[in-house]
Amino acid sequence: MFKHILIPTDGSPLSIEAVKAGIRFCKETGARATVLTVTLPFPNSPLAEYAAATHAMYDAGMKKAADERLAVAAGIAREAGVTCATRAHSDWQPFLSIVQTADEEKCDAIFMASHGRRGIAGLLLGSETQKVLTHSKLPVVVYR
């Protein structure tokens, strides 16, 4: 039924649990996984020189965070014996990166947490999960 599952993660505790559950789902269905993390780009500043130095530091920090998230996910997949690719994107609208990556990678479904780092604010402002559910043409499994 499913051959390739996209598993987005933001590194939050629930998201890590969703990665574990998504990898188990892949193992049970014989699917391979692609784990995606999406970081937010650096907010622009009118102070060009200051922004350049801060921008580089911000990018380095975001890359480190993304690499750590993906290493955790890859380790979970490796322990389960599931083939897993990893991707990191930077986007102001993470849901778009999730939907586009699922399409580009020719995934059959998306397996993701019900909410992430934004917590209550995410619920009030509209969660990325809700946006993925609205915009994806693929089945979306929501882990709670």
Annotate the PLM regions.
Residues A109-H135:
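Glycine-rich, Arg-bearing micro-motifs that act as flexible, cationic patches
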Residues L138-R144:
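Short, flexible loop segments at boundaries between secondary-structure elements
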Residues G75-I110:
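Structural beta-alpha unit
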Residues T54-E68:
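A short acidic, glycine-rich active-site loop
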Residues K3-A53, I76-A85:
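Small/aliphatic-rich secondary-structure junction motif
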Residues A18, S45-A48, L96-V99, G122-L124:
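Short, well-ordered secondary-structure micro-motifs
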Residues A51-T54, A102-E105, E128-T129:
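Short, hinge-like loop/turn segments at secondary-structure boundaries
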